[in-house]
């Protein structure tokens, strides 16, 4: 819950900056550069990168038969607000994709939550700072010799879906296709519903449906034309969305397909059932398995098209 996180942020803000500066040398070896974990059918390796002066914690997932002298398609996965890359892992996306032959990079947005390992306080995070983070991550991933530069994909959950869509609109030549999971295309509308005008947004902190956020978070999306902006991306997009999502209504994804992603290769996949809510992968195994199957099949098609 973002509201609970911001309360904790206030209590810990004095010490957090000093701790962030030493994250890579933390007492927790599991977040140290190069820390390796063997998973079923793949290997996870901690790999930090930077956005300017900010340290970004991330992990590569490599296929079981990974050979650094070869090149692999890559998926960069972005989490939602108040979440972390560990939640993306819990949803099984990185593991399944690596088992399918992809190199995957997941990371914690700077200020994306109180539980993340990257720099920046939660109250200083905005959709646009996350967009800058994702672009920096893309640049970092593209420096790896084993990354197939012609097959870079983005996957984003919730706010990470919106951030991925905005980033792809700016860097459409770098992104072959996108997989968006219940993308938070509602955020600008939420801001306008909460405040009658941008002048009504309070200083320091503000309220959104997800809870208390920094005022800049609301200000930076208040006048955002979401669909007009994301429509600059002309590649294929698959959106997967639960029909019982109350936080980000399904209708927002319907509108995205109707107004922004109008190409023949773009599609909206509904997830049905009582558990098809926001974040359905966490408690709806059948829905998660179906989403991952159709999602990876969608990406696989874009590999075969150019072989």
Label each residue range with its predicted role.
Residues 83-94:
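The serine-hydrolase catalytic nucleophile loop
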Residues 90, 249-259:
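Short alpha-helix in the alpha/beta-hydrolase fold that links the catalytic acid
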Residues 97-116:
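Conserved alpha/beta-hydrolase
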Residues 233, 239-241, 245:
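Short beta-strand/loop motif that positions the catalytic acidic residue
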């Amino acid at each position: 819950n973002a509201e609970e996180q911001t309360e904790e942020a206030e209590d810990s803000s004095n010490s957090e900056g000093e701790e962030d500066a030493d994250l890579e040398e933390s007492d927790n070896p599991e977040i140290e550069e190069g820390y390796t974990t063997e998973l079923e059918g793949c290997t996870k390796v901690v790999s930090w990168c930077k956005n300017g002066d900010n340290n970004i914690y991330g992990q590569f997932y490599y296929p079981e038969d990974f050979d650094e002298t070869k090149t692999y398609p890559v998926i960069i996965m972005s989490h939602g607000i108040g979440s972390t890359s560990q939640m993306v892992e819990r949803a099984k996306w990185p593991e399944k994709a690596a088992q399918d032959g992809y190199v995957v990079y997941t990371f914690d947005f700077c200020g994306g939550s109180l539980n993340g390992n990257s720099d920046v306080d939660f109250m200083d995070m905005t959709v646009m700072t996350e967009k800058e983070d994702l672009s920096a991550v893309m640049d970092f991933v593209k420096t790896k010799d084993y990354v197939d530069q012609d097959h870079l994909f983005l996957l984003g959950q919730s706010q990470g879906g919106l951030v991925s869509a905005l980033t792809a609109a700016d860097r459409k030549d770098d992104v072959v296709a996108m997989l968006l999971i219940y993308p938070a295309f509602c955020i600008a509308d939420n801001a306008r519903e909460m405040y009658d005008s941008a002048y009504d947004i309070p200083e320091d902190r503000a309220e959104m449906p997800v809870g208390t956020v920094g005022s800049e978070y609301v200000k930076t999306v208040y006048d955002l034309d979401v669909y007009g902006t994301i429509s600059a991306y002309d590649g294929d997009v698959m959106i997967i969305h639960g029909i019982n999502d109350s936080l980000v209504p399904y209708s927002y994804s319907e509108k995205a397909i109707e107004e922004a992603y109008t190409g023949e290769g773009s599609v909206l996949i509904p997830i049905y059932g009582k558990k098809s809510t926001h974040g359905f992968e966490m408690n709806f195994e059948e829905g998660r398995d179906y989403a991952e199957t159709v999602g990876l099949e969608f990406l696989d098609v874009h590999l075969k098209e150019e072989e």
